């Protein structure tokens, strides 16, 4: 009888452990309620006249979601070239930047980013630049991106280590807007 009880307790604890959601998985899940919605953003740090962002309407769209990949186009004015791609594998989240041209072809600088070095938190993931990024854009080798998401807001942030380069844009997730924008690619 004692062995049966121990076996049952072991089975319950294994089932409970499997049922727990990792921080990285919870981060990916946080996008799900926003699928198909658009949100307006504002630059909260690093914006300056002539940077291509300041003074433009900033929109994000959670265009697609599944448990392993989330695509979030980032529209800057009429420029529909940018999509943030979050991928989940081996309990880590990866961020890649997909850049396309207006004719639907890939930009020569695309798919840069990095993978979180740990499972992060349910509301924040950090992405140091990976080797692929360094090969593609040598000056971006010291980039660190971090993204936050909670019930009220989404932020995309970039810091270039060793410089004063900081860029942050924040989106209000409590106020979805109507848009028919779609990325160029």
How would you name each of these model-derived features?
Residues 40-67:
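Short, solvent-exposed loop/hinge segments that bridge or flank secondary-structure elements
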Residues 34-40, 65-73, 93-94, 151-155:
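Short, hydrophobic/aromatic-rich segments at coil-to-beta transitions
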Residues 85-132:
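An exposed acidic His-Trp-rich patch
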Residues 63-100:
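Mid-chain, structured segments of secreted extracytoplasmic proteins
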